[in-house]
Amino acid sequence: MASAATAGLTLLSGGASIAADIASIVTEQQRLALQKEQIRNNYELGKQSLSLQQQAMENSRDRIRLSAAQIKELGLDPKSELNMLMGLTAGAQPPISTPISSEQLFLNSSNLARSVRWDARNFGEAINTFAGLRAKHQANPNRPDMMLGSDNPNWGARATGDALSVSGLSVRSNHFGSGPSSLGSLSSVRSNPFSSISSGSVGGISLRTVGSRPSIRSVFSTTSV
């Protein structure tokens, strides 16, 4: 009797051990299945991330190619212009000691602005934010040649007024605003190839003279189109 009871207990103990082993194997299989699924999900997420990064790079290349083509249409050097724009976007100062060309005057700006270019052919290109920008003469970077923004009480609380909606300025003819100007006048607002804003309209601009050259003193009323 005792032997039979002992054999029965041994059998039960062995059965319980086998059941525990089976449960452990099932649990491990489930863990491995979950781990495999997690690895697969991470792999898919990595593929999607790489695909998005590649698409972003392609989009950047397309924007640079488009900007270069538009810069070239203006008769400027795409490589120099793009380098300057990239530097300004990052808040850097443009290289005043190495101007884009021998006849151009261009911007030494704060990091609030993209760029302002000024050349000897009396053509001005203003890009995006107007906030106390000072253009420098290439022969004498310490002398302000043109100032945009300045102090205008009509602007109200914002230092830049509504000038963010101005995307590009074309300077023509020989008279505007406060008096005669050998530089030209603001006769139109045109699309700016370097800005996400396509066009705008300027409601009021006044000119004043800095040294021997006039400057745009204020842009105090603008409307997006």
From Swiss-Prot:
Q: Which UniProt keywords apply?
A: Capsid decoration protein, Capsid protein, Host cytoplasm, Virion
Superkingdom classification of source: Viruses
What GO terms fall under cellular component here? Answer: host cell cytoplasm; viral capsid, decoration
| Keyword Cytoplasm part of the UniProt annotation | no
Its main subcellular localisation, reduced to a broad class, is virion
Per UniProt, subcellular location reads as: Virion; Host cytoplasm
Additional remarks: Translated by a ribosomal termination-reinitiation process from the bicistronic mRNA coding for VP1 and VP2.
In the UniProt entry, what is the domain comment? Answer: The N-terminus domain points away from the virion surface.
What's the stated role of this polypeptide?
Minor structural protein that forms a portal-like structure at a unique three-fold axis of symmetry, following binding to the host receptor. The channel formed by VP2 may allow the delivery of the viral genome through the host endosomal membrane.
Question: Quaternary structure?
Answer: Homooligomer. The portal-like structure consists in 12 copies of VP2. Interacts with capsid protein VP1.
Protein name (database record): Minor capsid protein VP2
Organism whose genome encodes this protein: Bovine enteric calicivirus Newbury agent-1 (isolate Bovine/UK/Newbury1/1976)
Q: Lineage of the source organism?
A: Viruses, Riboviria, Orthornavirae, Pisuviricota, Pisoniviricetes
